[in-house]
Amino acid sequence: KINIETKNVDLRNSEQMEDWFSKINPRNTVPVLVSKENNIFYHSLSICVYLEQEFPEINLLGSTNEEKGQIINLINDVESNLFIAIADCLRNTSKAMKNRAITGPKNYEQIPELAIRGRERVKSYFEILNHQLSGKSFLCSDRFTAADIWAFVAVDFTRAIKEPIPDLMTGLRDWYERVS
């Protein structure tokens, strides 16, 4: 466990759109980290890299060049394929996100077709993860890493779009239960 100051931001009430938060992160997105040097990090991966350098005992991003490369590769894959697909589905169907289909300070209309495509992409990515986890305990190594965290959070987030892990995908299901 690391000890850093945190502040909760109430997304349900759009607190991230308030002036105080916009001054910290004009993109109006979470998470965000303000470093000791007052630099702003607003992407999860950059925050993790910063924290791992500050607290090297964490070692979730790998200990060798090979392991680091594999972990970052999978994190980027999960971000660009699974998280985006879930976001497309959720942000283009949720009544709470009407006119907020994309994060940030500007409003964007929902496009229902993107939700349909997003759901199909989620199903396809489940197949990829299931194959990748076949006969393995973890995604990138013989131990729990940031790649497992990224994938777990994304797979768990599919509950928001009511897309469960299919029963036949035992590799993915077993891994999900193991890391939960």
Describe the function of each predicted region.
Residues 1-4, 162, 180:
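Proteins with a high burden of low-complexity, intrinsically disordered sequence enriched in S/T/G/P/A and R
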Residues 22, 69-72, 150, 173, ...:
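Generic structural signal for individual residues within well-ordered alpha-helical segments
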Residues 81-178:
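GST-like fold's C-terminal all-alpha helical module
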Residues 1-116:
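GST-like domain detector, emphasizing the conserved glutathione-binding G-site
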